[in-house]
Design a protein with these regions (language model features):
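N-terminal export/assembly leaders
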Residues: 120, 142-176
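Assembly/oligomerization scaffold segments
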Residues: 1-132, 169-178, 184-185, 189-195, ...
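Short glycine-rich, low-complexity/disordered patches
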Residues: 70, 151-160, 317-327
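Acidic Ser/Thr/Pro-rich low-complexity disordered segments
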Residues: 4, 82-84, 151-164, 229, ...
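Hydrophobic alpha-helical membrane segments, chiefly transmembrane helices and signal peptide h-regions
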Residues: 110, 137-140
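Acidic, small/polar-enriched beta strand-loop surface segments
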Residues: 1-23, 130-131, 135-136, 185-365, ...
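Hydrophobic, Leu/Ile/Phe/Ala-enriched alpha-helical segments that form helix-helix packing faces
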Residues: 77-79, 141-150, 190-194, 347, ...
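A generic structural motif
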Residues: 44-48, 104-113, 210, 216-220, ...
Length: 410
């Protein structure tokens, strides 16, 4: 049985106070529910025991006169005697709401968001972009004076955690002038044009060892065809193996939720790029995904992205949409690996459906993570995506390619 050691920091001063002793509950949600959704700002709600009045904003308690809005928050956990804790969330306080159900009780709930919310509060105004690959365009947006997203330092330290992780793209974006457009809206369009992803990542990619400067909350740009982070984890029935943690529940989807037989993609100023799966259309009808006003320079890149998508999702498949884990019920070694999981991690899941005789194995990518934590319990939910194909069809790796499947789509 794992025994997590928590450190919940709220930056009321230097050093950052640890408020763990007063925490009644934490809810964290990061990433997205499914592969077609845009990545949303991660959120964290921390409920604090405020019986002593310690956290009442503008009150007479210990932190009453402190700044609340905009201060940094970190949710860290140490497992398996690790040298450095794993970050489940790093972000900033948006609201601090006090509740007084009677004369003797009080709670304060801190509502927090991560770096995507920071981008959502800025606007790109009268900016000229050169023709450049997507990753260069992304950096140019972040470095624009009106956005000013924190830079990634060359040598991360405990005081200066790294904030960016940007893949090098080969997909060219057209030169453009952007006038008065929300930064988050523009970056969502950039991610679609890249056929990649932009998200804030918590945890530790691929289950790597946590360094001193790895505090989570890292803004990622994933290029087209980017592989998942290989974790080596296989979720299944009861097991004590460090790389085979048990799950408590598994959800699947099968049907029209991810079923498209036609795609219409178009870059700004370009012609419609239309792909139709003529073999599947007579069976499932015309089901169209439309993406217009993409930022690409070349129609060929747009057509490739459209083809990748249609031929991945033109027939229904049994897909695992999520798995649930109870980290406290795992071994220390298992819990440490599971706690590090975040968006874009690659995992396997094995399960035997009710009434079936043989176990199925699926290769999955993590799309979102939810933590629900109380002093005596911890539930973790992973939102996942995958092709729906069995692992025995895998070509080269469990996260990067499937025999006779187009592996280039998300």
């Amino acid at each position: 049985v794992a025994s997590p050691n928590w450190a919940i920091g709220v930056n009321f001063g230097t050093p950052m106070p640890d408020v763990s002793a007063d925490v009644r509950g934490i809810s964290i949600s990061t990433g997205r529910a499914r592969v077609l959704d845009a990545f949303q700002s991660g959120t964290c709600r921390i409920q604090l025991d405020n019986t002593s009045g310690k956290y009442t904003p503008l009150g007479d308690g210990t932190y009453g006169a402190s700044q609340f809005v905009g201060v940094e928050v970190r949710v860290l956990v140490t497992l398996n005697s690790a040298t450095n804790p794993t970050s489940l969330f790093r972000g900033f306080v948006e609201d601090a709401d006090a509740s007084f159900p009677d004369a003797k009780q009080s709670t304060v709930t801190l509502t927090c968001s991560d770096g995507l919310a920071v981008l959502g509060r800025t606007e790109i105004t009268d900016v000229d972009f050169d023709a450049e690959v997507g990753s260069v365009r992304f950096s140019a947006v972040l470095d624009n004076a009106a956005v000013a997203y924190p830079a990634e330092p060359g040598t991360p330290s405990s005081a200066d955690p790294r904030n960016r992780d940007i893949d090098t793209s080969v997909i060219s974006m057209a030169a453009a002038t952007v006038t008065q457009l929300s930064t988050s809206t523009y970056l969502a369009r950039l991610a679609q044009s890249e056929d990649g992803a932009i998200f804030v990542r918590h945890g530790m990619p691929g289950g790597a060892s946590v360094g001193v400067g790895d505090k989570g909350g890292v803004l990622h740009y994933k290029k087209r065809n980017a592989d998942s982070y290989a974790t080596g984890l296989t979720f299944g029935p009861s097991s004590t193996g460090a790389s085979t943690p048990p799950m408590t529940a598994l959800d699947t989807i099968f049907g029209a939720e991810l079923l498209y037989t036609k795609g219409v993609y178009q870059r700004a100023g370009g012609a419609d790029q239309i792909v139709t799966d003529t073999l599947q259309t007579p069976t499932y009808g015309i089901r169209t995904l439309v993406r217009r006003n993409l930022l690409n320079l070349n129609d060929s890149d747009v057509l490739t992205a459209c083809s990748n998508f249609v031929y991945r999702y033109s027939s229904p498949a049994l897909r695992i949409s999520g798995i649930t884990i109870k980290p406290r019920a795992l071994t220390e070694a298992q819990a440490e690996k599971v706690a590090k999981l975040g968006v874009w991690d690659g995992i396997l899941a094995t399960f035997t459906p009710a009434g079936a005789g043989a176990a199925l194995i699926r290769a999955l990518r993590v799309e979102g993570v939810r933590h629900d934590i109380t002093p005596g319990d911890w539930t973790m939910r992973l939102n996942t995506s995958g092709t729906g194909e069995n692992v025995y069809l895998v070509l080269n790796s469990t996260t990067a390619g499937y025999l006779n499947e187009n592996k280039l789509a998300p």
